[in-house]
């Protein structure tokens, strides 16, 4: 497929091999009109699950941002365990510095910035304990939450059974993806209730 330039309002080059930075308010029409390869890269920057991105691609063109968000919710609900792990792989631990592809997480974990060293150490220890118990990173909707709040939530979730915790992870991923997709479509995601986000752990947004 021939590469095309990123439409106005989209940061970065969606035609190259690298994932785009956090997208600005491009709008639904621009998203619907992107070539499939460019749209796929934009979606995978929101969530690294290939299955989730594929469902969203197949759903285009969306008549409204709300329809796209409903599609995202349904896609997350249909993810298999391997798909969920693939999605988790795209999130840094909460409290850790995000890498080059972690623009979303840096935004979402703003409440962790400037946290006192003792709380950061407790988060690091909590992340390790969580991963030892469940075998994957701690994913939580970090948007609007403080480091202390995320730590308290982590400690509470350590008491969950594995099956229960996977259900919580799926719910948190839905929130994160709604916030990110909403921003991609021009701010339609809303807050944690309508959209949500987390640092995956920080994993999360």
Residue ranges and their predicted role:
Residues 143-145:
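Short glycine-enriched loops at secondary-structure junctions
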Residues 138:
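Conserved catalytic/binding loops enriched for acidic/polar residues
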Residues 133:
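Residues forming anionic-ligand binding surfaces in small-molecule and nucleic-acid pockets
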Residues 1-130, 175-190, 202-205:
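Aromatic-anchored, charged helix-turn/loop surface patch used as a conserved interaction hotspot
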Residues 147-191, 196-205:
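Long, amphipathic alpha-helical surface segments
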